[in-house]
Amino acid sequence: MVDDIQVEKREKLIETKDKLLEEKLSALDPHEANVLRSQLETKRVATSFFRLFRFCTPLDVFLEILALFFAAVHGAALPMFTLVVGAIFNTFRDFTSYDLKGNEFQHKVNHLSLYFVYIGIGMLGSAFLESFLLVDRGEVLAGRYRKHYLSAVIRQNIAFYDKLGGGEVSTRIINDTNSIQEAISDKLGNVVQGIASFIAATVISFASQWKLACILLSAVGFMVITMGTGATFMAKYQLRSDAIYSQSGATVAEEALSAVRTTVAFGAQPHLAVKYEKVLDRVVKESKRSSYSLGVMLACIWASTFWVYALALWQGSREIVSGSADVGKIIVVITAMLLGSFQLGNIAPNVRFLVKGLTAASILNEAIDRVPVIDGQSIDKGIVPQTKAVGRIELKNVKFRYPSRPDVLVLSDFSLEVPAGSTVALVGASGSGKSTIVGILERFYLPLEGSVTLDGQEISDLNTRWLRQQIGYVQQEPVLFSESIYENISYGLIGTDIEFADEHVKEAKIIQACKDANAWDFIQTLSEGIQTNVGDRGFLLSGGQKQRIAIARAIVSDPKILLLDEATSALDTKSEGIVQDALDKAAEGRTTIVVAHRLSTIKDANKIVVMSKGNVIEQGTHNELIQREGPYKALVDAQRVTKAKSTNVEVLDIEALDISPLDSLNEKFNPKDVSTLSVHSAGTQTTQPPEYQENDIPGVRNPPHSTLMTNTKLVWGLNRKEWGYILIGSLASIILGYCYPAMAIITGQTTGSMVLPPSEYGKMRHVVNIMGWWYFFVGCISFMTAFITIAALSLASDKLVKNIRLALFRQLMRMDIAFFDHKNNTPGALTSILAKEAKMIEGLSGATLGQIQQSLVTLIGGIVTGIPFNWRIGLVATSVVPVMLVCGFVRVWVLTQLSDRAREVYERSGSMASEYTSAVRTVQSLTRELDVVVKYTKTVDSQIFSSRIAIARSALYYALSEGMTPWVVALVFWWGSTVMRRGEASVAGYMTVFMAIITGSQAAGQIFSYAPNMNSAKDAARNIYRILTATPSIDVWSEEGYVAPEESVRGDIEFRHVNFRYPTRPQVPVLQDLNLTVKKGQYIALVGASGCGKSTTIGLVERFYDPLAGQVLFDGKDLREYNLNALRSHIALVQQEPMLYSGTLRENILMGWSGPESEVTQEMIEDAARKANIHEFIMSLPDGYETLSGSRGSLLSGGQKQRIAIARALIRNPKVLLLDEATSALDSESEKVVQAALDAAAKGRTTIAVAHRLSTIQKADVIYVFSGGRIVEQGDHQSLLELNGWYAELVNLQGLGEI
């Protein structure tokens, strides 16, 4: 368990990093500080309400105004019929005073009731148009926000991303745009309705009796002040809450999910869960403050409504006595203002959504309005030469610091000249500034001083888009997009004449690039050839195949400049040799700058530049530098491999060695070949698994579908600790809900007394005075219950969202690796579920739950109250309620269909945004910014187009439910007059029923207005239920299994007849009858082509997967017999691509510790760092071990990240050390030191090393050569050389020339 003090320390460090950064900037020269600030600064944007509509076209403005007009008509219609009510009450007065006969009374009431029917028709039409136009435009405008935000973010300079959390962009583009969509859709309509209703009520009241209207209006000022103050505080705390989650919580989740293999290998789930929970606690703290603000605001509005009406009725009775008003006018004023204030009060919950929308828009607008200091998307900024670049590059006296690390000088007075058409190699230690040179040439960053020119022209004066289109750029870690191979390579043609050429011409160019990059042969073996989809981040291809596709993409445009940042580092030896030949050929006539650790790849460079700490310490050709016997000679000696005595070996076909998950797709799949091992201590019995289905989730026993009951159990189960808050809040909401029916009784008695003849005015005044005190009492009750309802239920809701997010996070950390291989479970999609869908559960809890309970009580209470006062009128009025409910239910069903389609599209668009922004360097180097936005736009627009019919259906059923209210009123008055004519009802009883039914009908409408929230919550609950109830096949939570005593663990490993296929690709054999033995303390190496099964072997030892047949044994026991956590505690893994987490360097190293953190001393941490050759570097940093690593270690170089990862493995003191290309990212000097440390650390431990650099495994006890999932050779280095076979050829291909 992680110590809370350390977690709090980390949180404090992250919170103050901006302040610390500013302090470091202030210590620099003002000019340098300004250059660095310009790359980082984002100005705070104050977003007004009207800026929510900043992306409206003239048509959008017209439709929005039209929609708001219909919303206003809809809102004003309800108070309008109070004029009819007043006329009817005067008719009642005349009837009770015998001025009207029965038939005449009936005829007059029937005539007046028809006006309610007309008003209902008007409300139905206006409600339909309002709902359809607002929801449709809301979806359109939110889509535009999504597109503009992605467009703005993807064009920002790279320093902007150095401060950005890994999951922040995807969270913003899903969560925040969804908040904007809610704010400008039906919630805005509800606000306009409320305002229009109140204004109409006020106008009618003043026109009827201005003195009484003035008294009622006195509450408006108080309400406005209350709402304004409440909204201000809500916005403040909501902004804090959203910012905390997006910047910290989403980043923790995204990093954990993206690096899930590292996370589970080191058992880091508890640490990350604590880290995540701390962020969620801070989110709850700010959300609670926002909820309290809402509670106070609503309580004041409720109470003021009752108190003002007590005064109004008292004053109204006085006006009647004085003869300045009749009962009809008094009823008009009271009823109009009652309905108007009711609508005004209902604005408050909707204001919360407006505040959230404004808060979200202000955050998005910061990025949208930010003008990047380096803009690669602009086509008109800077000089655009009319011809291609020649390729002469020169850097003079360049000084450089990274904006996020201003206290570290990276380049100091650096100068380099690269003649056109020449090849220059940059070598040196990690962190010496090699990759920085590439970043400056690509204009990812700005130099502080000095000159950088291309063909004599300052690159800062050139158009950045044009500049990048002159460069072919291949990074150390190949980045492919989840599209076809053809599309991935075609992105290299952006900006060329061929980009929009005939497809045949374009395809020929792409195919030639594939051939030049040695990729065409393996592409032809794929089932769909060049149209094969490479999968998320290219996971369906091996590392070498991905790199060759990336190289083809870089050279397809025939650029004049090639920047190769470790371009062949991911290739196996055989592939590297052939691809290097292709690159050497491609470099002819081009300016090529190569950053290299493998010195065998740059022997033929025209100039080799040796760098150290940002300076050139040596330069010359390979032979010249060898003869000087300086730093370069030492690097060469460190990489030299003992060569085979004879090179007379048959040349092997590279494709025979290079196997990827897709290479065997043409092979017919026989389900009988796939079997699952029954868990026995010995033997290899197999059982037949069910046939693989596309929708199944690999590695997971899929749960049953969720139902209303399961959703309820889910919510209650995760919220049961807050049952006290829920109980108190529910009781308060029930009491609050009955306040309106109680007011119907009070109003009925009051208005009944007001139709009394003048001779009984004394009785009227007495009744009014008593009822006034009841109003005051009910107002006090509503104040307390409204605050308690919002405060208690919102707190429970905030805790529920926290619990769901934490439970989801822990469950995701529990899932086995096969789960994450599934196409639907990308890091972007899962981060979206954590951010958005967990939040949507509020639709079944919190303020929404309180409003629903309150509305139900008001509806039922209105019926229960009305019927006893006059069952004849009450039953008829109540009979219409089921019709309204049916309309509401149908609307919910339509919304369900709409939400299902929208969720699928927005999850996909969220994953797309996450993919593009996480590969921003690749996107910008390819000048894909506009192309990315176009593709994203198509995805978003497809949802908007497909959802319009569903939106129209939803609007129709909503309109029907709204139009029913005046029709119910017409029915009540028609039937009521009939009953009164018969002498079976009094005015007081009739008015009580009327008021109870009116408020009840409105309550039913309120229930339906929450249908979108309830529907979204239901969909979210279904997805959450799917994950939370899934049980992984390899369960890290299981406490079952053998736990070996520490002293008895040896570290023997054995593979017996192991067959394996990945669950998501069961037709592709990966390991076939693999037999391999590793004894305690042995150092064995696995070599071979990319995709031949080496890393899969590592994964099976870690038990990321189980074999389909055969056994993997640890100390003689099948891995499946062990307790999983206990097993992994004896194993440490260092992967090819180092994955670090946001936090300090100390925390990242401590991730490897498997025991209590309290047992770890600083000396132990430093010792692990020294062994990994990283301690001195850490101590050179101003903050030492407390230095923040940045998102995914973005503030460190590749070699530095890898050494932190090695230190993380060594502090674990494992019995088994798994090294999957552990030194591939290190320079030769560091590699030699680290390899010596690893060799020392391997003593007494079982070590399995996957290696392409054969120099690192010469001393291995046994070397296994893999091909096609089988072992084709085994032995030590010397014996394999003597065989003069597969291994000998790999050695000869990798050796450097003789000195």
Curated annotation (Swiss-Prot):
PROSITE patterns: ABC_TM1F, ABC_TRANSPORTER_1, ABC_TRANSPORTER_2. One of its GO terms (cellular component) is plasma membrane. InterPro entries: AAA+_ATPase, ABC1_TM_dom, ABC1_TM_sf, ABC_transporter-like_ATP-bd, ABC_transporter-like_CS, P-loop_NTPase, Type_1_exporter. It is an enzyme of class 7 (translocase). Residues 393-638, 1053-1293 form the ABC transporter domain. Coiled coil: none annotated. GO terms for molecular function: ABC-type oligopeptide transporter activity; ATP binding; ATP hydrolysis activity. One of its GO terms (biological process) is oligopeptide export from mitochondrion. It is a multi-pass membrane protein. Residues 86-114, 209-214, 315-326, 747-769, 870-874, 976-987 are extracellular. Induction: Induced in early stationary phase (at protein level). Residues 65-356, 727-1016 form the ABC transmembrane type-1 domain. Residues 681-690 have a biased composition (Polar residues). The chain crosses the membrane at residues 65-85, 115-135, 188-208, 215-235, 294-314, 327-347, 726-746, 770-790, 849-869, 875-895, 955-975, 988-1008. Its EC number is 7.6.2.-. Residues 1-64, 136-187, 236-293, 348-725, 791-848, 896-954, 1009-1299 are cytoplasmic. It is found in: Cell membrane. SMART domains: AAA (SM00382). Keywords: ATP-binding, Cell membrane, Membrane, Nucleotide-binding, Repeat, Translocase, Transmembrane, Transmembrane helix, Transport. ATP binds at residues 428-435, 1088-1095. Residues 681-703 are annotated as: Disordered. Belongs to the ABC transporter superfamily. ABCB family. Multidrug resistance exporter (TC 3.A.1.201) subfamily. Transports acidic acylated and non-acylated sophorolipids (SLs) into the extracellular space, where they can be lactonized by lactone esterase. PANTHER family: ATP-BINDING CASSETTE TRANSPORTER, ATP-DEPENDENT PERMEASE MDL1, MITOCHONDRIAL. This is Sophorolipid transporter. It comes from Starmerella bombicola.
